């Protein structure tokens, strides 16, 4: 789907993936297959065949129930077991992946080498290795668009659809794609520096940044953060069925476009900016959605205070 269309591309991609999972489960599905027994079989397929986490399974069931409610309302479906189907799926809180300020500055200031350059890197365990730069132009675009999100709180979808007309001097006014909220966001010096890099090349269709799909952005963002040695080990805990799984990865492997907005929120709160003001920039309407970020910053504050004990 092209930019500028009203349907959220991210939502479209999620439902496309959901449709694929249904076809993999049973290419000849009928509504009658979604009895309680069939629903349990679908959950087992997602867990055992596709190796999904419980949190992901819950999202897939949410998509399925939405579709079955629609089909029931339209008279296509008469099997209503889904209305009462609520499997116990043990979950943990999702870890907030974001860049600390020093890490963000490392990415922001990174001078991407030319294609084919062999970059010497050091892993968190001290191991040295080389990585070849694959697409310098895409990495530079990724750096700038991602950092713009980190400095403005924009979701990637809103940064990708940002138009020159949205920029008004020291601020920008946008209507968000996901929630249709109209927000006025002041531009700090870092965001302005990024805009200056693109002013001479603003496209004829009015978009501020050159287009990269979310999928490509995520791919190049991991490579960019690896080149910047954003490799602190991060452990994630999740459940697959009743099995608890603990996985540790270097942070760059966990980076995605979602981390841009999270980076803005966490750093703003750690700078001492009140949650009320941050919410005016992000468009959050209640503290519940801000709580994971506040919890992260409270932990960071406690760790920072312990530095006094080490003096």
Give short role names for the model-derived ranges.
Residues 9-13, 25-44:
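A Lys/Arg-rich helix-loop hairpin that forms a DNA/phosphate-binding surface
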Residues 152, 161-197:
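Conserved tyrosine-mediated DNA breakage-rejoining catalytic core shared by Y-recombinases
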Residues 128-136, 202-203, 207, 222-280:
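Short, basic (Lys/Arg/His-rich) helix/loop patches that form interaction surfaces
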Residues 54, 58, 77-156, 215:
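Basic, Lys/Arg- and aromatic-enriched nucleic-acid-binding interface segment
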Residues 176-180, 214-217, 282-307:
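Catalytic-site neighborhood detector that most strongly recognizes the C-terminal catalytic loop/helix
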Residues 165-171, 254, 271-292:
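Short, polar N-cap/turn motifs at the start of nucleic acid-interacting alpha helices
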Residues 1-18, 74:
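Short, aromatic/basic-rich helix-turn unit that serves as a nucleic-acid recognition element
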Residues 107-110, 186-193, 197-198, 292-311:
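DNA/chromatin major-groove-contacting recognition/catalytic segments
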């Amino acid at each position: 789907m092209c930019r500028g269309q009203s349907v959220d591309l991210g939502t479209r991609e999620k439902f496309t993936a959901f449709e694929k999972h249904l076809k993999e489960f049973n290419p000849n599905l009928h509504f009658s297959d979604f009895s309680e027994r069939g629903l349990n079989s679908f959950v087992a397929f997602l867990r055992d065949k596709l190796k999904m986490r419980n949190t992901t399974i819950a999202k897939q069931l949410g998509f399925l129930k939405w579709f079955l409610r629609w089909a029931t309302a339209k008279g296509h479906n008469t099997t209503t077991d889904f209305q009462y189907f609520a499997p116990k799926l043990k979950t943990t809180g999702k870890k907030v992946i974001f860049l600390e300020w020093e890490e963000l500055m490392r990415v922001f200031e990174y001078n991407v080498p030319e294609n084919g350059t062999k970059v010497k890197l050091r892993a968190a365990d001290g191991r040295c290795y080389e990585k070849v730069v694959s697409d310098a132009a895409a990495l530079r675009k990724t750096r700038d668009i991602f950092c713009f999100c980190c400095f403005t709180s924009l979701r990637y979808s809103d940064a990708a659809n940002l138009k020159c007309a949205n920029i008004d001097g020291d601020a920008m006014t946008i209507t968000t794609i996901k929630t249709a909220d109209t927000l006025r966001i002041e531009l700090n010096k870092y965001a302005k520096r990024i805009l200056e890099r693109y002013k001479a090349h603003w496209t004829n269709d009015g978009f501020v940044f050159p287009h990269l799909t979310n999928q490509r952005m995520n791919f190049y963002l991991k490579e960019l953060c690896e080149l910047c040695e954003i490799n602190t080990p991060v452990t994630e805990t999740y459940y697959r069925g009743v099995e608890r799984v603990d996985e540790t990865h270097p942070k760059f492997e966990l980076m995605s476009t979602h981390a841009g907005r999270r980076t803005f929120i966490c750093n703003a709160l750690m700078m001492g900016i009140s949650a009320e003001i941050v919410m005016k920039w992000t468009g959050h309407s209640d503290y519940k959605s801000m709580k994971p970020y506040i919890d992260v910053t409270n932990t960071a504050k406690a760790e920072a205070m312990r530095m006094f004990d080490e003096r």
